[in-house]
C-alpha cells in the first residue's frame, strides 16, 4: 500500500556548488515556500558524487511536486541527473514544475539538453514575457509555451546593514579620488549580457577625457563559448585593457555592496532590452547609484511585475531607447551623475513572498 508523500515539494539543486544566480534563486525559493508552509519542502542535491538512482527514486517518492530550475551552471556536466529525477517523477506520477530562467540567450546545445525537461514538465514557470515568446518561436520547443506561466522575479541579494572592505573596493575608491569615472556591471559574465558592448561605451568615455574604469563585479561562465578570450581581445583592440577590472566571484553580500558603494553608475546595454528576469539589475538598484539599461522590447514586459515597474517609474532604473548608439549610453552615464540619488526602500521579504506564492500556486 502506497503511503502519502511526506512533503509538498522536492527542490532539486546542487548544494554548496550552486553559486550562480539561478542556484541562489533555487535555494531562496525553497526557503520562501517553507516559510509559507513550514515542513512542506525537501531538497535533493545532484552533483557528480551526490544523487544515485536509488537516492533520486526515494526522494521523488517523498513529495507531491518536484521543482527544478534551469540553467544551473554547476549542472552543465551532470545534466543527466536532474533529467533522470524528472523522468522518475513522471513515472511516479508526481507533478513537475520546471522553472526556466532563460531560453534564446542559452547556447543551442544547452537548449537541446533541456528539451526532455520541457516535455516532462506539467508547468513551466518563466519570469519574462520576452523569454516566453522566445520559447514559443523556437521551432523545436515552441509547443512547450502553452505550459508557461509568469511569476515575478525577486532580487537574489539584499543590501546588508554594513559593507565589507576589500582590496578591490580600496582600489575603486582610490580611482574615484583620482577623478576616474567608475562604471559598474554586476552579475555573471556571458554572451547573453553582451559584456563587450560596455567596453565600447568605455572607449567612447575615454576618448572624451572622462577617464573611465569599467568594473565587472562577477565572473565569466565557462562553456563552449569563448566569451572570456573574446572579451579580453576586444578590450585590447579598444585600448581599454588597463581600464577594465573583472572581480571574479565575490563571496559575500557585504563585499558585493562594498564594491557597489565605490561605483559611480551601472550600465547594461542589452540586445534584448531590459526584461523582468534581470535580478542583477534589482541588486544594483539597491545601491542608490544610477542604473542605465536598454529599454524593454515588449510593452507588456512588466505587467506581471508591479514592483519592478515601480523602480522604472521612480527613476531608479534609467532606460535608453532601443536602437540607440553607444554615444547615447555614454551621455546617459555622464548626465546621470548629476541627478540626485534615488534610494528606493526594498521589501525583500515581500518580493520573495510574491514569487513563493506564484510558484506554490502551481502545486
Predicted regions span which residues?
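Short alpha-helical donor nucleotide-sugar binding micro-motif in glycosyltransferases
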Residues: 118, 249-250, 257-263
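A short helix/loop element that forms part of the nucleotide-sugar donor recognition site in Leloir-type
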Residues: 160-176, 231
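Conserved donor-binding/catalytic core segment of Leloir-type glycosyltransferases
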Residues: 175-193, 199-202, 215
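Glycosyltransferase donor-sugar binding loop
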Residues: 213-229, 249
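Nucleotide-activated donor-binding/catalytic signature segment of Leloir-type glycosyltransferases, i.e.
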Residues: 228-250, 314-319
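Acidic donor-binding loop of glycosyltransferase active sites
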Residues: 258-275
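A charged, aromatic-enriched C-terminal amphipathic alpha-helix characteristic of glycosyltransferases
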Residues: 320-363
Amino acid at each position: 500500500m502506497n503511503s502519502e508523500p511526506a512533503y509538498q515539494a522536492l527542490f532539486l539543486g546542487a548544494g554548496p556548488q550552486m553559486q550562480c544566480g539561478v542556484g541562489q534563486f533555487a535555494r531562496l525559493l525553497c526557503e520562501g515556500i517553507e516559510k509559507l508552509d513550514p515542513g512542506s519542502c525537501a531538497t535533493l542535491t545532484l552533483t557528480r558524487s551526490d544523487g544515485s538512482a536509488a537516492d533520486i527514486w526515494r526522494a521523488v517518492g517523498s513529495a507531491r511536486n518536484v521543482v527544478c530550475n534551469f540553467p544551473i551552471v554547476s549542472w552543465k556536466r551532470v545534466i543527466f541527473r536532474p533529467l533522470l529525477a524528472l523522468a522518475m517523477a513522471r513515472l511516479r506520477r508526481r507533478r513537475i514544475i520546471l522553472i526556466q530562467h532563460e531560453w534564446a540567450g542559452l547556447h543551442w546545445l544547452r537548449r537541446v539538453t533541456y528539451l526532455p525537461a520541457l516535455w516532462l514538465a506539467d508547468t513551466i514557470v518563466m519570469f519574462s514575457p520576452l523569454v516566453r515568446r522566445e520559447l514559443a518561436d523556437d521551432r523545436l520547443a515552441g509547443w512547450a509555451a502553452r505550459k508557461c506561466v509568469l511569476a515575478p522575479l525577486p532580487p537574489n541579494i539584499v543590501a546588508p546593514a554594513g559593507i565589507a572592505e576589500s582590496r578591490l573596493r580600496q582600489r575603486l575608491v582610490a580611482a574615484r579620488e583620482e577623478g576616474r569615472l567608475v562604471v559598474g556591471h554586476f552579475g555573471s559574465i556571458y554572451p547573453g549580457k553582451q559584456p563587450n558592448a560596455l567596453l565600447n561605451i568605455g572607449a567612447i568615455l575615454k576618448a572624451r577625457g572622462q577617464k573611465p574604469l569599467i568594473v565587472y563585479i562577477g565572473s565569466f561562465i565557462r562553456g563552449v563559448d569563448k566569451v572570456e578570450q573574446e572579451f579580453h581581445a576586444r578590450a585590447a583592440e579598444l585600448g581599454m585593457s588597463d581600464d577594465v577590472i573583472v572581480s571574479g566571484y565575490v563571496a559575500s553580500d557585504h563585499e558585493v555592496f562594498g564594491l557597489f558603494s565605490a561605483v559611480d553608475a551601472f550600465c547594461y546595454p542589452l540586445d534584448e532590452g531590459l526584461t523582468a528576469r534581470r535580478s542583477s539589475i534589482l541588486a544594483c538598484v539597491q545601491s542608490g547609484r544610477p542604473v542605465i539599461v536598454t529599454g524593454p522590447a515588449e510593452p507588456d514586459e512588466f505587467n506581471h511585475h508591479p514592483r519592478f515597474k515601480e523602480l522604472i517609474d521612480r527613476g531608479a532604473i534609467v532606460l535608453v531607447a532601443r536602437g540607440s548608439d553607444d554615444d547615447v549610453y555614454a551621455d546617459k552615464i555622464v548626465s546621470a551623475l548629476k541627478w540626485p540619488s534615488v534610494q528606493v526602500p526594498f521589501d525583500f521579504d515581500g518580493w520573495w513572498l510574491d514569487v513563493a506564492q506564484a510558484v506554490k500556486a502551481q502545486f
